[in-house]
Amino acid sequence: MKTIVLFHRLELNTLFVPVGRALDSAGGVRVVHLAYGSEELAQLRAAGITGPVTVFKDEIRRLYRPGPVDPGDLAELDAFFLKGSKGAFNLNAALQSDRGFPLLSLDEAQGLTLAYHRFWGEFQQRYGADAVLHEPCTLMFNFVAAMHCAARGGDYFYPIMAQGPGKGFNHLLMSGFDFTCPDLDRRL
């Protein structure tokens, strides 16, 4: 049985709640709901999701340690990113690519990255996710999730809106950290 994580943040609840229900109904897939924060958790509960839901922000608060990160941990992160991205990103490149990290000190950005790495490692051990659905890898916590999926031979997916036929919009399913689109690949 495949395990799919639906990582709910902001408006993704609107999309992922019915997706989760459809996957549950189809059978053969275990759906795990991950809420970004307490607001998303409340929305999931209001939508009738009653099972256990991990709250990402609570877990990061538990795992984050202020102050300089141990150089050994930084070397581990660097090697993990290089391997998972097939050489496209090292730790420094990933830190510089996060659109939110310019607001933080280097110690804070490295500490958060280590907390994200520990979270996704624990989460993957607990649930053995074959796929994570969330949003593009423009923030470190998404990039780290994609790297953990790659390490397990799994997939990191995210939907984007694209102009469809006529005046409508469709969702395209993208994968990985490099903006690969299986939908387009199949059609080409």
Each language-model region and where it sits:
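Nucleotide-activated donor-dependent transferases that construct or modify glycoconjugates
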Residues: M1-E11, Y36, L133
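Beta-sheet entry/capping signal
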Residues: K2-I4, R30-V32, D130-A131, G153-F157
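Short N-terminal targeting/anchoring amphipathic segment
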Residues: L6, Q124-T138
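Charged, amphipathic alpha-helical stretches
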Residues: H8-R21, H33
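Short, well-ordered alpha-helical microsegments
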Residues: L12-V17, E40-L41, M140-F143
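Conserved N-terminal ligand/cofactor-binding loop architecture of enzyme catalytic domains
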Residues: A22, A26-W120, M161-L188
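Glycine-rich, histidine-containing beta strand-loop boundary motifs that form or position
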Residues: A35, E135-P136, F143, Y158-A162
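Glycosyltransferases and closely related glycan-assembly transferases
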Residues: Q124-G128, V144-Y156
